[in-house]
């Protein structure tokens, strides 16, 4: 299979990547000593390094015991590997799983990884759709679940949030205070990946993306293990890079997010027959073009196919408890098969959306962005439905073409506090963010699904270019393993990210020993399709 061959090639390349030089051993040992770890007293670190990851796992177990270092072939290990959203991630087998409970222990892992040449990955929510994104084959998977604080500062204008939280935990902790933060739209999504990748929220037309609502990050230095604060005034270049740059410049152990008032949301999943697509798109574009008029409205539309049938689902959310807001009037005029309109808290809303988002299936995300154009959008929907029957023979296959808009208010807020790494601004938009999501049962059908998504976007991108509507931006949180996300931020931003990464991590620890997810120079896996 093409996909399996590509994964094996990627693993081979990962193994061949230049590691941080062993001449740093003395510096790393000194950094560990500052953290209370005496290398000479740990047999796995002071003796021969015959198997780097066995040495690393053994040394962590020596330091922290079996409660924090989960060994292979144990029930606890199985529970973790089966907790990923996508089955592809659950198939990855790390040498051990490390569960730190304080920031210092994260620093120790980063330093021990350098001594032993053992790669690692980190799991916040584990909601990526491909192997290695937050799991490390043969390396160490660091599970952040115990770094789960949610505390308010004295004036309650910011909340300190650990990367082990999912958004449901965050909203549950803040709602009794009448507060929320700009975060994910499903309760099960992890704080870490969503925020460093951008982070679209129900509140994004009002406040911007999650990454643009971070007061500061607390970040592990690969050089020393020190915890650095990255904010508009402290290490502002690092702060810029973490707002969209993913895991390339440091491990974040705490997100300090600005709080917002927690409101009741009025929302619905409104389902339409596929023959209403042009009317649905007319409503979609009307809401998108009026985001600056009423920022309380948020929407996405899924043009779906399952069990050989086409359908349309519009998720329409209003961040006030207002019946029939005027901005959604065109949607209400279209006959619906079903409508779930109700008033809920943010937590209830995110819990409800997540009920259909079950773990353990094979998953795909793949996205691209375009200039907002209604004729092109209608063409893309017609094209999707014309080729979607290719997947009807795949057991359990469900696929959707998802439409969202990066609105003008969102783009305007991306310049806040020095801007972010995404390469977008108000002159870019509004931008039509288009992605395919798919789920299915068996590895034997991987090539069919991946090939379908690749072919769709190859054709759609060519059509967009012929119309002068292409926009190269790829959203990290919806990208496939075959996409080079960082290059889509533009040459200048890519160069700046590389410069900042070299400044804070000159030996490339976060590029080579943390090889998973979207790196500065390449896609996770070469596209075989």
Residue ranges and their predicted role:
Residues 2-3, 8, 15-529:
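Soluble FAD-dependent oxygen oxidases
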């Amino acid at each position: 299979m093409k996909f399996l061959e590509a994964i094996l090639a990627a693993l081979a390349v990962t193994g061949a990547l230049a590691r941080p030089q062993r001449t740093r051993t003395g510096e790393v040992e000194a950094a560990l000593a500052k953290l209370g770890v005496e290398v000479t007293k740990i047999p796995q670190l002071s003796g021969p390094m015959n198997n780097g990851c066995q040495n690393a796992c053994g040394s962590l177990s020596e330091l922290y015991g079996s409660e924090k270092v989960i060994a292979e072939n144990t029930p606890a290990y199985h529970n973790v590997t089966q907790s990923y959203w996508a089955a592809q991630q659950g198939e990855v087998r790390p040498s051990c799983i490390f569960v730190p409970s304080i920031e210092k222990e994260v620093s120790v892992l980063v330093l021990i990884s350098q001594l032993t040449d053992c790669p690692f990955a980190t799991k916040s929510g584990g909601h990526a759709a491909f192997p290695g994104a937050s799991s490390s084959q043969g390396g160490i998977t660091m599970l952040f679940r115990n770094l789960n604080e949610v505390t308010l500062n004295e004036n309650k204008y910011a909340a300190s949030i650990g990367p082990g939280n999912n958004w449901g935990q965050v909203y549950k902790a803040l709602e009794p205070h009448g507060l929320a933060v700009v975060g994910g739209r499903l309760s099960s999504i992890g704080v870490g990946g969503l925020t460093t990748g951008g982070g679209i929220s129900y509140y994004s037309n009002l406040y911007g993306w999650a990454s643009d609502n971070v007061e500061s990050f607390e970040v592990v230095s690969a050089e020393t293990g020190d915890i650095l604060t990255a904010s508009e005034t402290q290490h502002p270049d690092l702060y810029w890079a973490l707002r969209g740059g993913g895991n390339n410049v440091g491990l974040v152990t705490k997100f300090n997010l600005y709080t917002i008032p927690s409101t009741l949301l009025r929302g619905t999943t409104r389902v339409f027959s596929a023959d209403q697509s042009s009317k649905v798109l007319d409503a979609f574009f009307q809401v998108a073009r009026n985001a600056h008029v009423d920022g309380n409205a948020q929407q996405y539309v899924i043009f779906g196919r399952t069990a050989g049938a086409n359908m349309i689902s519009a998720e329409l959310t209003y961040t006030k408890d207002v019946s029939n807001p005027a901005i959604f009037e065109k949607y209400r005029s279209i006959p619906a098969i079903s409508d779930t309109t109700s008033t809920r808290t943010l937590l209830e809303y995110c819990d409800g959306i997540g009920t259909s988002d079950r773990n353990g299936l094979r998953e795909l995300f793949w996205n691209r962005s375009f200039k907002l154009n209604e004729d092109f959008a209608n063409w893309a929907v017609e094209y999707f439905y014309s080729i979607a029957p290719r997947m009807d023979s795949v057991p359990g296959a469900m696929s959707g073409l998802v439409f969202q808009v990066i609105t003008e208010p969102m783009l305007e807020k991306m310049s806040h506090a020095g801007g972010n790494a995404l390469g977008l601004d108000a002159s870019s938009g509004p931008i039509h963010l288009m992605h395919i999501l798919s789920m299915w049962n068996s590895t034997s059908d991987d090539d069919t699904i991946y090939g379908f998504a690749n072919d769709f976007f190859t054709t759609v991108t060519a059509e967009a270019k012929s119309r002068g509507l292409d926009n190269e931006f790829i959203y990290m949180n919806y990208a496939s393993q075959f996409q080079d996300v960082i290059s889509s931020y533009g040459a200048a931003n890519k160069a700046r990210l590389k410069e900042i990464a070299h400044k804070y991590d000159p030996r490339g620890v976060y590029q080579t020993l943390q090889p998973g997810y979207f790196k500065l120079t390449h896609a996770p896996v070469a596209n075989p399709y």
